């Protein structure tokens, strides 16, 4: 089944792939079966609802898979290509046939005509719409940029100035969004601005209006204040307080009722005015100016923030909101005096609160100053006591240190003296014992000689054989003992000679030379001595592999190093090129000190180090150079390392020489 499903796709493959499929099919089918055998072995299957009628129908049926077409490059003829096996019929129930057929249809005839060539591949779709996509992306990007810019302009004042000044149409977009937001939050603001209070008029009477009469400028100012109150979003309104909105609604209802009553009074008085004559109604305009159509309203100014107290500021906001509501009302003249009095009382209360607050601040400031002075006095006293205690402790520690150091020095001196005296006494006693032994031996020898002569004279030579044998044994024992003493002395002398060879190799060399051979000779001569092994192990491998400089070379290198240190003596820790140049120029004009100097500057340290090197005290010179700081210490790092190696080698040689002397004294 897998092979039959792959067969239609072979037409789209290349000749190489087709050849591979053909070879694979040849491997899978070792022999070609005839169509009759195929038809007898496995019945053919047709789709549901179709039946085989003719051989042409079977040959042209698209549901029947055709064998793959051979490639033009293939050498296998089409007749030898095996056909794919037909699919098995599907049985719905046991014992039933497929589509009511009892006999399989005859197999299709096999023809030698090659199959038609495969259709050419469809052409690749042309890439188009690049300009259209570019325009769409550009429009979307511009829209998103403008939307983001407007949103940031509403959030940040700095970006608002930049966006409205440098971006085209940025100011119009921001204004449009702000206007829509304002209209959404205050839908009745424009209605209140355009509203005008107009008194009812009588349509049935003709009235001549003088030129200077009419609406006064104060009414316009009141309308302007109303407009400002309506457009000021920061003030308290219905969007900030629901209680004030209810109060405003009640005031509006009251004003509406009063307007209705006034209108009824005007309508009742209208018939009486119609009965009057025209001469009484029409008056000259220059004799008496008419009152304005709308009475002027004296608005009450809002309170200013007198105190920074949050409670007082909240009360001030409440009173200002109340004043704004009353100023917006048409009948605010009734509350003007009351509001003015309340405003004056509130201002006086604010001044009193400010005075009390100032007094409290002054009193607190005085208390703070007193507390600060007391704190400073206490802190100074505490610091003084701490300094005294610290000075006493330092003096006590210094005395204890000096006494302990003197005690340890005296103890070590006494110990060294005792050891030397004991070694001298042991050596003298050993010499005396040796002399006594030699005297005894001489006496014994003399006695033996006398006895031998006597025996010789008396008994002859045979009587002296036993004595001679005993004497020979004693002489051999004495010879062995003296040989060990001689070997020890010889080994000690060789060790001393090897140490002198190392020292001469280090002191007489003009350039640093390795002294591995000399050090190996010293180690072989003292192979069983742990002190000598420890001293040799303390020497750095770099020292005996590369050599160490001589004192003259150390002094010469120090003089070259001192010049560089003087150049870098004025550099800070994080110096740049300018600092290096300035330090180099300043080093040219610096005077070199001579003699002993007790200062801590770089020049004094260099002077003391040079004097110590001339005296041969390398240890103290290294300590002086190690006290440098900054770039000076960095430059002298290599020189200090060489001096340390020289001191390590020198100390090791001194230890080896001391151990050799002690071995000479310990010989019995």
Curated annotation (Swiss-Prot):
> Could you confirm whether the keyword Membrane appears in this record?
yes
Keywords for this protein:
Coiled coil, Membrane, Mitochondrion, Mitochondrion inner membrane, Transit peptide, Transmembrane, Transmembrane helix
- GO CC terms in record: MICOS complex
Give the stretches traversing the membrane: 134-154
A Gene Ontology biological process noted in the UniProt record is: cristae formation
Query: Please, which domain of life does this record's source organism belong to?
Result: Eukaryota
- Compositionally biased intervals (Polar residues): 90-100
- The segments labelled Disordered in the record are 30-49, 54-128, 195-284
Bilayer topology reads: Single-pass membrane protein
Pro residues bias (residue ranges):
79-88, 103-125
Transit pept. (range): 1-29
Q: Which family does it belong to?
A: Belongs to the MICOS complex subunit Mic60 family.
Name of the protein in question: MICOS complex subunit MIC60
UniProt source species: Uncinocarpus reesii (strain UAMH 1704)
């Amino acid at each position: 089944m897998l092979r039959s499903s792959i067969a239609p796709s072979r037409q789209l493959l290349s000749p190489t792939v087709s050849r591979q499929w053909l070879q694979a099919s040849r491997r899978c089918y070792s022999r070609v079966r005839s169509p009759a055998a195929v038809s007898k072995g496995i019945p053919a299957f047709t789709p549901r609802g179709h039946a085989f009628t003719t051989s042409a129908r079977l040959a042209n049926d698209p549901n029947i898979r055709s064998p793959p077409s051979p490639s033009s490059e293939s050498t296998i003829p089409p007749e030898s290509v095996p056909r794919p096996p037909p699919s098995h019929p599907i049985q719905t129930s046991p014992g039933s046939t497929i589509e009511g057929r009892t006999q399989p249809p005859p197999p299709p005839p096999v023809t030698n005509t090659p199959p038609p060539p495969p259709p050419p591949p469809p052409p690749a779709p042309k890439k188009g719409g690049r300009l259209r996509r570019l325009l769409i992306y550009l429009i979307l990007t511009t829209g998103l940029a403008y939307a983001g810019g407007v949103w940031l302009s509403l959030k940040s004042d700095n970006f608002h100035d930049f966006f409205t000044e440098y971006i085209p149409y940025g100011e119009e977009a921001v204004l449009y969004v702000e206007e829509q937001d304002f209209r959404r939050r205050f839908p009745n603001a424009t209605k209140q601005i355009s509203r005008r209070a107009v008194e009812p008029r009588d349509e049935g009477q003709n009235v001549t209006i003088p030129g200077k009469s009419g609406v006064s400028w104060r009414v316009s100012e009141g309308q302007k204040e109303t407009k400002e109150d309506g457009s000021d979003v920061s003030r308290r309104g219905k969007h900030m307080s629901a209680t004030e909105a209810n109060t405003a609604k009640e005031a509006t209802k009251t004003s509406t009722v009063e307007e209705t009553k006034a209108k009824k009074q005007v309508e009742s008085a209208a018939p009486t005015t119609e009965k009057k004559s025209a001469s009484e109604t029409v008056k000259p305009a220059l004799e008496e100016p008419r009152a304005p159509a709308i009475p002027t309203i004296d608005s009450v100014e809002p309170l200013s923030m007198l105190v920074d107290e949050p409670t007082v500021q909240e009360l001030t906001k409440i009173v200002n909101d109340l004043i704004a509501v009353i100023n917006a009302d048409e009948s605010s003249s009734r509350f003007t005096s009351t509001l003015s009095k309340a405003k004056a009382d509130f201002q006086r209360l604010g001044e009193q609160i400010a005075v009390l607050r100032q007094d409290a601040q002054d009193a607190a400031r005085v208390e703070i100053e007193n507390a600060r002075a007391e704190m400073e006095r206490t802190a100074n006293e505490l610091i003084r006591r701490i300094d005294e205690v610290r000075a006493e402790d330092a003096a006590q520690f210094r005395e204890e240190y000096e006494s302990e150091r003197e005690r340890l020095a005296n103890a070590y001196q006494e110990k060294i003296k005792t050891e030397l005296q004991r070694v001298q006494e042991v050596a003298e006693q050993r010499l005396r014992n040796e002399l006594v032994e030699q005297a005894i031996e001489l006496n014994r020898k003399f006695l033996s000689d006398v006895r031998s002569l006597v025996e010789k004279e008396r008994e002859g030579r045979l009587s002296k054989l036993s004595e001679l044998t005993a004497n020979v044994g004693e002489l051999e024992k004495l010879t062995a003992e003296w040989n060990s003493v001689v070997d020890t002395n010889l080994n000690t002398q060789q060790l001393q000679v090897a140490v002198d060879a190392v020292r001469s190799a280090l002191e007489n060399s003009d350039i640093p030379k390795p002294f591995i051979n000399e050090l190996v000779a010293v180690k072989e001569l003292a192979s069983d001595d742990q002190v000598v092994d420890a001293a040799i192990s303390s020497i750095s491998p770099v020292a005996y592999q590369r050599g160490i400089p001589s004192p003259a070379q150390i002094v010469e290198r120090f003089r070259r190093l001192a010049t560089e240190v003087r150049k870098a003596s004025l550099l800070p820790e994080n110096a740049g090129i300018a600092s290096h140049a300035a330090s180099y120029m300043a080093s040219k004009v610096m005077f070199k000190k001579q003699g002993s100097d007790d200062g801590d500057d770089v020049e004094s340290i260099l002077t003391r180090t040079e004097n110590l090197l001339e005296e041969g005290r390398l240890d103290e010179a290294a300590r002086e150079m190690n006290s440098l700081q900054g770039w000076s210490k960095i430059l002298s790092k290599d020189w200090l390392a060489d001096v340390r190696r020289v001191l390590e080698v020198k100390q090791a040689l001194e230890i080896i020489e001391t151990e050799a002397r002690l071995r000479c004294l310990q010989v019995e």
